[in-house]
Amino acid sequence: GSNQDQIKEAPVTIALFTDTDLAKRARKIARVAGVRNFSDEQLQFYMQNLPAEFARYNDQQKSDYLALNAGLVAMNLVLALTDQGIGSNIILGFDKSKVNEVLEIDERFRPELLITVGYTDEKLEPSYRLPVDEIIEKR
């Protein structure tokens, strides 16, 4: 069915957002992770250098960074769901311009993708993938 049908029929739909304020996000991650994992010196390094690094990103670099991170999160989530016997489907084709308003989420957060989640009685078959030798070239 269509993406809209999947969303309507799924018991759960996850909307995955990225935080477009990379500097603020980096500081928060450094603070939270730093308490457990970083020396004071390391924490200071991350608090000063990561925000400055992100500030140098142009719009395309920022968009690529956010999309890549969203993809990694989605992949891990889908693998964890699959491991628990729960079906899921990643949806990229949706009207991103309305999601923040409908869900009342600050515009700072960018909708990246939706994941429909649920159990199914159908025997799931893997979707077609190109053969490895068509996508990887050994040199």
Question: PLM ranges: what are they?
Answer:
Residues 1-139:
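Acidic, surface-exposed loops and disordered segments
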